């Protein structure tokens, strides 16, 4: 099987094309960092109509046409994920740089709906991409605990569930020293599980964030999580809209929160291509 390896702010992915089956055990094998290629997840590039015909999705969401490219995203544990912001940037970079599309602005199908992307610049190995992420839907306040520490956060639906906890007085140095592990959360509030972000308060338009992702563990970045974190940080600062620079262990991205939507802008890198027997 041919594959590529890419990342968006070091949230890394194995990229595969084609309509062949992608069972959970294959995803786990590909993402294994010792016995496989190693990644936080798998980006499967497939036409939306082909995914529908295979029965892997029940219908095409509004705005997704049968001939649109669909990001079939899988977590490292083999589970299906609704959306991945960093993955969408890498996905868009791949289809644009490999000539699968000739336009710089196009629709990417996801299980969280149609996402408009703009590839601002690209080469075979590097790109800068914006993704229209849709509205950050605030679910309310919930709590969780991690490594013996309890905290309250803002529940945010970005097509996938997030609990973004802005911790008063938390510095970037304090955040870097924290131990992240499987969180204990309110399963009634988050019945499908949750991605948990720990966030520093907004300062001069900048926040720092770390994330423990559902199905992947701690990752170097999470695109949907940066939008959820920006939303929570703005709310903590008594703001509804704004532009936030989000610094994660793997780099930084720009998030714009408006009254009716959100935009995520950041880099994509393709670092390898090859073939695997997995």
UniProtKB/Swiss-Prot annotation:
Catalytic activity, EC: 5.1.1.7
Q: What residues sit in the active site?
A: 84, 222
- List residues traversing the bilayer: none
Judged by the first EC level, this protein's enzyme class is isomerase
InterPro entries the UniProt entry points to: DAP_epimerase_AS, DAP_epimerase_DapF
PROSITE patterns given for it? Answer: DAP_EPIMERASE
Q: Does the keyword Isomerase apply?
A: yes
Which Pfam families does the entry link to?
A: DAP_epimerase (PF01678)
Q: Which family does it belong to?
A: Belongs to the diaminopimelate epimerase family.
Q: Could you tell me which PANTHER family the record lists for this protein?
A: DIAMINOPIMELATE EPIMERASE, DIAMINOPIMELATE EPIMERASE, CHLOROPLASTIC
Name of the featured protein: Diaminopimelate epimerase
């Amino acid at each position: 099987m041919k594959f590529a390896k890419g990342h968006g702010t070091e949230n890394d992915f194995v990229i595969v094309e084609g309509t062949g089956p992608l069972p959970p055990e294959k995803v786990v094998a590909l993402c294994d960092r010792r016995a496989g290629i190693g990644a936080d997840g798998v980006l499967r590039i497939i036409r939306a109509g082909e995914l529908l015909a295979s029965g892997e999705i029940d219908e095409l969401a509004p705005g997704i046409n049968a001939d649109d490219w669909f990001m079939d995203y899988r977590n490292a544990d083999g589970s299906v994920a609704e959306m991945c912001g960093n993955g969408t940037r890498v996905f868009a970079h791949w289809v644009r740089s490999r000539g699968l599309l000739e336009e710089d602005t196009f629709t990417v199908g996801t299980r969280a709906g149609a996402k408009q992307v703009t590839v601002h610049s690209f080469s075979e190995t590097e790109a800068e991409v914006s993704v229209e992420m849709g509205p950050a839907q605030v679910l309310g306040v919930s709590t969780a605990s991690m490594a013996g520490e309890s905290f309250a956060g803002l529940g945010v639906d970005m097509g996938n569930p997030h609990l973004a906890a802005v911790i008063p007085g938390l510095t970037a140095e304090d955040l870097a020293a924290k131990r992240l592990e499987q969180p204990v959360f309110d399963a009634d509030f988050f019945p499908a599980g949750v991605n948990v972000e720990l966030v520093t308060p907004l300062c001069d338009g900048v926040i720092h964030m770390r994330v423990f992702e559902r199905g992947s563990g701690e990752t170097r970045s999470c695109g949907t999580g940066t939008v959820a974190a920006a939303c929570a940080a703005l709310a903590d600062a008594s703001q509804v809209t704004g532009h936030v620079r989000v610094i994660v262990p793997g780099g930084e991205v720009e998030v714009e929160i408006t009254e009716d939507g959100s935009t995520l802008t950041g880099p994509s890198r393709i670092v390898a291509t090859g073939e695997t027997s997995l």
